[in-house]
Curated annotation (Swiss-Prot):
One of its GO terms (molecular function) is structural molecule activity. Belongs to the papillomaviridae L1 protein family. InterPro entries: Capsid_L1_Papillomavir (IPR002210), Capsid_L1_sf_Papillomavir (IPR036973), dsDNA_vir_gr_I_capsid (IPR011222). The keyword Cytoplasm does not apply. This is Major capsid protein L1. The gene is L1. Keywords: Capsid protein, Host-virus interaction, Late protein, Viral attachment to host cell, Virion, Virus entry into host cell. It comes from the Viruses. The keyword Glycoprotein does not apply. It comes from Human papillomavirus type 64. GO terms for cellular component: viral capsid.
């Protein structure tokens, strides 16, 4: 997509939607089902033909970094969207205040009160582990110098 407001990167992830078209290269692969040293007479059942479709994509991204002031309202909004964002930024968060007494002690995690051994930190669960994506590694190609790259359309 080209233009304003195309997306936001969170958790160092960016998703790109590709619409399938058949304008690339189609090719067929013919494979024999039996391997014999002699040349038997041709039979259609001795061969399997597969049709493959190859596509090549040239991806170009321009990222605009912005700075925001992390006020309590902004942090509350980010926390309501996804609390793991602020956890990855290593912000210590306290839950929202509650008026009832039982809610006051619900979030206490002191080892002196719970009498438990320290738990190892939980590994964050990948929400996309069951899905298949193409991975595009931008580590070596990422640069702040835009004049070093030709952008095509």
């Amino acid at each position: 997509a080209q233009g304003h407001n195309n997306g936001i990167c969170w958790h160092n992830q960016l998703f790109l939607t590709v619409v399938y078209t058949t304008r690339s290269t189609n090719f067929s692969v013919c494979v024999g089902t039996q391997s014999t040293s002699t040349n038997p007479p041709y039979a259609n059942t001795n061969f399997k033909e597969y049709l493959r479709h190859a596509e090549e994509y040239d991806l170009e991204f321009v990222f605009q970094l912005c700075k925001i002031t992390l006020t309590t309202d902004v942090m509350t909004y980010i926390h309501s969207m996804s609390s793991s964002i602020l956890e990855q930024w290593n912000f210590g968060l306290t839950p929202p205040p509650s008026g009832t007494l039982e809610e006051t002690y619900r979030y206490v995690t002191s080892q002196a009160i719970t009498c438990q051994r320290p738990q190892p930190p939980k590994e964050s669960e990948d929400p996309y582990a069951k899905m298949t994506f193409w991975e595009v590694d931008l580590k070596e190609k990422f640069s702040a110098e835009l004049d070093q790259f030709p952008f095509g359309r």
